[in-house]
């Protein structure tokens, strides 16, 4: 199967599904997501009758999401440096092995809570490795104009699974037992692995000269740290997910303790969330208020029909926020750091859920279920009201395409790729009347340098030269600087540099300084 479509289909919400490779993998991911939600329902339902149930049930979500918090950035670095297809296939095999063990021990009635949480954590490790690699693959499968639709379809896959998986799991738990639910989840990993084996990319996933793992890890962290747009996206995700995690963490207890429902009824509640999520819009503030209102309904209304009805708009709100911030990240991140940037987003998302679930479970144990849900609902409403204060930034006019425009450096000596650190100086001449504007314009250039590899950056006046300015920045190695030359820069970086250089006069002089103690 070819990974590159011959032509871009008409732009529509469903256009990516007309591409055979995307459709095949999307259906496989849907099957895997259905299995994952069945697994969650089964694991939580095994614990609802245990002592300390509020904490144990909430810990299922923590065990699932904590690996993403711990491993997201390393997983993103792996996805940016290794063959993504092979990485995904290997991870699915690992997940299937864990699933077989989980199924066998549950069927043998040898599944104490500690072991269940340990194996749930192991499944979370696999998901942590899968998420950034899969998210980074999506832009390779569809034309750029279909990326928003493809991202939305990815979210729809999750929420279709959230609608179907819990309902099926509820029936299976009641009729066949939890072990059968775990077996179905294990089979879903095999389905995804099979689809990946059938996919044959036109070109290798990894770069021609892969980055070293530690260098890639540091480069990803620098990019996120020095990108205001990415930091704002992460802030909005965190402000929603932390209070929002209360619903997912405490819903099993609402079902069993307040509504008197069995596993089938709990599945229906989760299905109502999923149905609403499939039909979401793009209104962040309204979404937050709606979700907060649903948490208050769960706290105050012990009527199953009303709670089920309230969960549908909550699903809409959840999907609204997730699809909005996820698409914003995918559209903004350049290809060279996409998996690492998305992994940080997943880290914030998973960390918010894992730590939030732990906090809401502890509060539920100390103050009661109603108090925990009411506090979470109020916190969500406050977070929603911050949208006008810290909105997502409009990046529709920002050119994110790669731009190779720096001239190749010509050195009088041979520099080893790992030689470093390397100091780069750029000398400018700026007329007095333009100097204030030049200094301001160079702030954007400095952010660009840091995003693409510079550890330090500064702009200085040349004391011995009238109207002279010297830009100085340090990169970890010669290899890292060559990567700046060879594909890390985007059209937006080029535009920022051109705005600054338009304020200068005469030639610009560039020098590369290498360590004196290295040959």
Where on the chain are the PLM-derived regions?
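Short, well-ordered beta-strand segments in beta-rich or mixed alpha/beta enzyme
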Residues: 363, 422-428, 458-487
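An amphipathic, aromatic/His-enriched active-site/gating alpha helix that lines ligand/cofactor pockets
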Residues: 395-396, 447-456, 474-510
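Residue-level signal for well-ordered alpha-helical positions
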Residues: 344, 441, 484-487
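Solvent-exposed beta-strand sheet faces enriched in polar/charged residues
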Residues: 184, 460, 511-513
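Intrinsic disorder in cytosolic terminal tails and internal cytosolic loops
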Residues: 1-15, 390-424, 429, 436-440, ...
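Alpha-helical transmembrane-bundle signature of multi-pass membrane transport and export proteins
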Residues: 1-394
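Short, conserved charged micro-motifs
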Residues: 433-438, 480-483
């Amino acid at each position: 199967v070819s990974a590159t479509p011959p032509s871009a289909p008409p732009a529509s919400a469903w256009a990516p599904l007309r591409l055979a490779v995307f459709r095949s993998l999307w259906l496989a991911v849907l099957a895997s997501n259905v299995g994952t939600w069945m697994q969650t329902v089964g694991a939580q339902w095994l614990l609802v009758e245990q002592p300390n149930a509020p904490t144990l049930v909430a810990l299922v979500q923590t065990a699932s999401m904590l690996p993403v918090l711990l491993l997201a950035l390393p997983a993103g670095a792996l996805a940016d440096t290794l063959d993504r297809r092979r990485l995904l296939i290997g991870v699915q095999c690992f997940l299937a092995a864990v699933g077989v063990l989980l199924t066998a021990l549950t069927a043998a009635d040898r599944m104490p809570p500690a072991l269940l949480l340990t194996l749930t954590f192991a499944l979370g490790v696999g998901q942590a490795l899968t998420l950034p690699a899969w998210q980074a693959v999506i832009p390779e499968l569809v034309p750029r104009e279909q990326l928003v639709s493809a991202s939305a379809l990815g979210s729809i896959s999750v929420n279709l699974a959230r609608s179907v998986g819990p309902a099926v799991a509820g029936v299976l738990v009641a009729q066949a037992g939890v072990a059968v639910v775990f077996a179905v989840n294990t089979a879903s990993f095999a389905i995804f692995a099979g689809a990946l084996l059938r996919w044959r990319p036109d070109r290798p996933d990894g770069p021609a000269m892969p980055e070293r793992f530690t260098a890639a890890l540091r480069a990803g962290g620098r990019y996120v740290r020095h990108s205001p747009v990415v930091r704002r996206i992460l802030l909005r995700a965190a402000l929603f997910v932390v209070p929002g995690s209360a619903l997912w963490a405490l819903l099993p207890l609402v079902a069993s303790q307040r509504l008197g429902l069995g596993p089938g009824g709990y599945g229906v509640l989760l299905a109502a969330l999923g149905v609403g999520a499939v039909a979401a819009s793009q209104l962040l503030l309204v979404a937050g208020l709606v979700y907060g209102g649903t948490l208050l309904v769960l706290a105050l209304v012990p009527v199953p029909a009303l709670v089920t009805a309230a969960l549908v708009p909550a699903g809409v709100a959840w999907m609204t926020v997730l699809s909005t911030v996820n698409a914003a990240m995918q559209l903004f991140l350049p290809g060279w750091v996409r998996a690492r940037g998305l992994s940080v987003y997943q880290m914030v998302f998973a960390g918010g859920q894992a730590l939030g679930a732990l906090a809401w479970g502890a509060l539920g144990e100390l103050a009661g279920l109603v108090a925990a849900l009411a506090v979470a609902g109020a916190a969500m409403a406050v977070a929603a009201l911050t949208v006008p204060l810290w909105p997502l930034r409009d990046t529709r006019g920002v050119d994110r395409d790669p731009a190779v425009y720096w001239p190749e450096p010509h050195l009088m000596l041979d520099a080893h790729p790992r030689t470093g650190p390397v100091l780069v100086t750029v000398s400018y001449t700026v007329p007095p009347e333009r100097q204030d504007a030049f200094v301001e314009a160079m702030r954007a250039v400095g952010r660009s340098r840091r995003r693409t590899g510079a550890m330090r950056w500064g702009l200085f006046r040349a004391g011995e030269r009238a109207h002279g300015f010297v830009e100085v920045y340090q990169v970890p190695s010669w290899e890292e600087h060559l990567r700046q030359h060879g594909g890390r820069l985007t059209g937006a970086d080029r535009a920022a540099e051109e705005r600054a250089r338009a304020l200068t006069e005469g030639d610009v002089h560039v020098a590369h300084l290498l360590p004196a103690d290295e040959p």
